[in-house]
């Protein structure tokens, strides 16, 4: 495909990311209206660059005419404050009627050897386009802020070392992953106190805005 064909091919994926970001951010807004803790802290999204798509297709032996079977061309990340929030968000997504969950991978219960932790869902999302309805695959990653910090660092190191991270650095990453996991556990233990403090701050902020 030339540049124009790739641009046309990626249009529905960009549309899917933007629509889902609006919908998922809307969930957080509804919790805020109710002065309740939102299991969603924030949402980000992206469409894979063409170079990354081609690299993965080569690595996974995916022919170009089957490129739509790639599950993460469109991707969203949902960040949560607490590990328990991940289960709540997961149940919300499974209950939705505007897309269908077609795959899931739990890297929290069984983290990768590198130390990577996250919960992945793949959904089939229907789009309304000028040519009619089109379904695209979107990967949704759900993780805590600590998990996301670790994953961002690992991604940067993978890029720096072209996927061949030195063993000494790998060991430090694994230790950092264990530390991040302990942090999540500790935060879960004081969840009630954290939420009370956040609620008090939110009430104070609203009060000052109304004055």
From Swiss-Prot:
Pfam families listed in its UniProt record: RelA_SpoT
The protein's Enzyme Commission number: 2.7.6.5
GO molecular function: ATP binding; GTP binding; GTP diphosphokinase activity; kinase activity; metal ion binding
Mutagenesis or variant effect for residue 42 to A: No stimulation by (p)ppGpp, protein still forms tetramers
Signal sequence annotation: none
Enzyme class: transferase
Keyword terms of this UniProt record: Allosteric enzyme, ATP-binding, GTP-binding, Kinase, Magnesium, Metal-binding, Nucleotide-binding, Transferase
Protein name (Swiss-Prot/TrEMBL): GTP pyrophosphokinase YjbM
């Amino acid at each position: 495909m030339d540049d124009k064909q790739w641009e046309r091919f990626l249009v529905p994926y960009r549309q899917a990311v933007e629509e889902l970001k609006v919908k998922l951010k809307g969930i957080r807004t509804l919790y805020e209206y109710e002065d309740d803790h939102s299991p969603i802290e924030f949402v980000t999204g992206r469409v894979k660059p063409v170079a990354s798509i081609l690299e993965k297709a080569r690595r996974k032996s995916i022919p170009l005419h089957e490129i739509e079977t790639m599950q993460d061309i469109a991707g969203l990340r949902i960040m949560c404050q607490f590990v328990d929030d991940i289960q709540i968000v997961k149940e919300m997504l499974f209950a939705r009627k505007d897309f269908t969950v077609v795959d899931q991978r739990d890297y929290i219960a069984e983290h990768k050897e590198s130390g990577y932790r996250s919960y992945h869902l793949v959904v089939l999302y229907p789009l309304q386009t000028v040519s009619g309805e089109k379904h695209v695959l979107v990967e949704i990653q759900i993780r805590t802020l600590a998990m996301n910090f670790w994953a961002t660092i690992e991604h940067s190191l993978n890029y720096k070392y072209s996927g061949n991270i030195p063993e000494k650095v790998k060991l430090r990453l694994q230790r950092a992953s264990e530390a991040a996991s302990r942090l999540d556990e500790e935060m879960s233990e004081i969840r009630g106190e954290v939420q009370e403090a956040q609620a008090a701050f939110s009430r104070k902020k609203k009060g000052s805005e109304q004055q």
